[in-house]
Amino acid sequence: MKILLDQPLNGMKMYLESYGYEIVTAYEKKMTQAADDDLVKASIKEDSIFVTNDNKAAKLARMHGAKLIHIDMAFLAKVIHNELSK
């Protein structure tokens, strides 16, 4: 299974690779400044799962029917807060 990580999530690469996933980052594809549309099209062309934390990019991916995992940063912040509040 191939995964394309959006720029802010590059740090997840080694963790996902340790689970056996084939990971490509926007940075490695020299698409760090690419428009969201280009990233979505690249993920569709390569039959990759597009992983992003960007709401606009996620909406665009849904419109194009791309395989998508949208990481909601507000939800993630709440999880961290709840863990720290214990």
Where are these regions (language model features)?
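Short secondary-structure boundary micro-motifs
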Residues: Y21, T32-Q33, T52-N53
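A local structural motif
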Residues: T25-Y27
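Acidic, PIN/NYN-like endoribonuclease modules and their adjacent C-terminal/linker elements
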Residues: M1-Y19, K30-M31, D37-V40, A58-K86
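Acidic, metal-binding active-site segment of PIN/NYN-like and related structure-specific nucleases
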Residues: I44-R62
